[in-house]
Amino acid sequence: MMKRNILAVIVPALLVAGTANAAEIYNKDGNKVDLYGKAVGLHYFSKGNGENSYGGNGDMTYARLGFKGETQINSDLTGYGQWEYNFQGNNSEGADAQTGNKTRLAFAGLKYADVGSFDYGRNYGVVYDALGYTDMLPEFGGDTAYSDDFFVGRVGGVATYRNSNFFGLVDGLNFAVQYLGKNERDTARRSNGDGVGGSISYEYEGFGIVGAYGAADRTNLQEAQPLGNGKKAEQWATGLKYDANNIYLAANYGETRNATPITNKFTNTSGFANKTQDVLLVAQYQFDFGLRPSIAYTKSKAKDVEGIGDVDLVNYFEVGATYYFNKNMSTYVDYIINQIDSDNKLGVGSDDTVAVGIVYQF
């Protein structure tokens, strides 16, 4: 019974913070370094070769490694940094050995008492403060939180100010302001101009509410794409959650303008949706003996796509479950029941996908 009760406490912490189970490797004279990581044996199952499916088919094994460090400069001022890297384990040792390997996070900053923290580097965009509420599925999810896409996911060149508990005056009231520097890359998909975003959230006794918004200039290369118009990209999202008594419920609604990447597989043209409307729902329950079932629904619809009109980008129901043997070892299955029509005008895959994984994390 004691083991079951411990799992009921530890598992939600692991889901919210990927470093909650980190191994402390140094702690001396006000300097602390924690190492964290995981190895995931993972396989996707879809019809045929998976080209017309939600998630593909075959081996998807990967590992991640990261560290978090902090140094106590004085009684009020603390320095900190974090780095995280992804290693694909489904590559050969030949020419494709480095395919998919990437830096996920790399930033450093300072925190001063109740005034807040300021950091710079590769970090999460502030709109993910809202989208993170529903990015909780065993394997899938987070479909609208694209990386290197302005403010909705991990992105480079962001300066972020965060304040917790409103200068120490209101417990649970948090806000953030973020500046996104210009990233003019070789591909329009992962480029962006200068922009500013912000978020505000309030949490009380398991309930949470959040709103976030970001707007940025688009690069010349993005404006030249055949799909998507406008000089500005905008993204916003709201979220509600309940996280208490072993229950997790969350919902997001958001919209984007000239910001969500799309590709027409029939014409081989790419660009951005002029507008999207996104709905994400998730419900989970943590049993004391380690089982955590999950159900979810996600729909992202593009509006006014050139030559097409309105079209679904993502549309599915999810059923899955994770079983935690202890705080370090788990296994899961995640099933996407795809609701995309077989005649989708962008050629988005309409077949289902099942993921089966086993995880060691520390």
From Swiss-Prot:
InterPro entries: Gram-neg_bact_OMP, Gram_neg_porin_domain, Porin_dom_sf, Porin_gammaproteobac, Porin_Gram-ve, Porin_Gram-ve_CS. Pfam families: Porin_1. Changing residue 139 to G: In strain: B/r; AA sequence. CDD domains: gram_neg_porins. Disruption phenotype: Leads to decreased susceptibility to a number of hydrophilic antibiotics including ampicillin, cefoxitin and tetracycline. Deletion of ompF confers resistance to colicin E5. It comes from the Bacteria. Its main location: membrane. Induction: By growth in low osmolarity conditions (low sugar or salt); activated at low osmolarity by OmpR, repressed at high osmolarity by OmpR (at protein level). Levels of OmpF protein decrease in a lon/ycgE double disruption (at protein level). Residues 46-60, 89-104, 123-156, 182-193, 218-232, 258-274, 304-313, 338-352 are extracellular. The chain crosses the membrane at residues 23-28, 30-45, 61-73, 76-88, 105-113, 116-122, 157-163, 172-181, 194-204, 206-217, 233-244, 246-257, 275-287, 290-303, 314-325, 328-337, 353-362. GO terms for molecular function: colicin transmembrane transporter activity; disordered domain specific binding; identical protein binding; lipid binding; lipopolysaccharide binding; monoatomic ion channel activity; porin activity. It is a multi-pass membrane protein. Residues 29, 74-75, 114-115, 164-171, 205, 245, 288-289, 326-327 are periplasmic. Residues 1-22 form the signal peptide. Gene3D superfamilies: Porin. GO terms for biological process: monoatomic ion transmembrane transport; protein homotrimerization; protein transport. Keywords: Cell outer membrane, Ion transport, Membrane, Porin, Protein transport, Signal, Transmembrane, Transmembrane beta strand, Transport. Homotrimer. Forms mixed heterotrimers with OmpC and with PhoE; other mixed heterotrimers are also probable. Forms pores that allow passive diffusion of small molecules across the outer membrane. (Microbial infection) It is also a receptor for the bacteriophage T2. Is the major receptor for colicin E5. This is Outer membrane porin F.
